[in-house]
């Protein structure tokens, strides 16, 4: 990101690692544990520098990172123009009497209020979780979720940056909707 020119992309749409800090069946995924908050601060500062319009930053507040997520929201409160909720209709159930985490946040950052391409756009999207997830990565975002944001808040030929490109969901949806994309 430091190599990108100021205001060189129209939008950013990305989902950083969760920072699970667990030694379970997903232990081989290299989430950033030690400096997770600082990583997100650095990334958001760079995205604010390179993005002309809005940043859609998908983040999940779980048991391990909840305090850091709320700190992040506080630190960027002047740049956050909206917060959208992705409600999962079939989330992974919690064990015992623990509360099932059924939502993820989309922090929307920018210098101006967010306007939709459609009328009556809600700040909540409800979908099932991705049942066709590859074995190597069990948390791939559904294309429906990316399509919701990209179709409603960007226009054809806009350049969309995803700095945590992963399996390329942003690219697939951008191409389908005639947007340009950069994935790193």
Please give the residue ranges for each predicted region.
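Core catalytic lobe of class I
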Residues: 1-184
